[in-house]
Amino acid sequence: LQAGDEIRLTDGKGMFYKAEITTATGKRCLFKVLEAVPHPKEWSGHLHLALAPTKNMDRIEWLAEKATEIGFDELTFLDCRYSERKVVKTERIDKILVSAMKQSHKARKPLLNEMEDFKRFVARPFAGQKFIAHCYDEADVAGVAKASEDKAMDGGKPFLLDELDAGQDALVLVGPEGDFSIEEVRLAQAHGFR
């Protein structure tokens, strides 16, 4: 790149900028903004994904990249009873979010939160829709039957997209590889998750 070239920039907060390079050296680049262009969100609500990180970091990084490309707003890691990973280097995940935002031409970088205790997280207020993805049968969760070791993968549960009210804020919990404990599912449901 050299002086006079036009470039496109983003602030990561919803704006694109058309700019012209005024000075380009090996160590820095100066530019002047020619035009600010707001970029509307694809989803008018706030989409928050809270998940227990997997043992394999590659999977977490892939999810962060793809979720950014799709267009979610916030990511929180949860420390659950069956979590195999108790620490996530959010600096690396943040770099992946920035890279995915640029690669997919998004104007917003998702908010990235540090690892949080599951019990404290589900007790926090959230005004929007709240969902928890789990593999238990509803009878098991309700305590009607003993939690089965052989959990059905669908359990007759509805698909998330069928349950979401378009344009409203939504918080989705995704558990660890061994699923949430049944106590965690019950606690989440007691706090309004479905």
Language model features with spans:
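Short acidic/polar active-site loop segments enriched in Thr and Asp
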Residues: 2, 73, 194
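Short secondary-structure boundary segments
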Residues: 11, 79, 134-137, 176
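A glycine-rich beta-strand to alpha-helix segment
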Residues: 20, 160-194
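RNA substrate-binding interface of SAM-dependent RNA methyltransferases
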Residues: 38-135, 142-145
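Strongly charged, low-complexity linkers/loops
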Residues: 134-136, 141, 156-166
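Short Gly/Ser/Thr- and charged-rich N-terminal loops/segments
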Residues: 148, 153
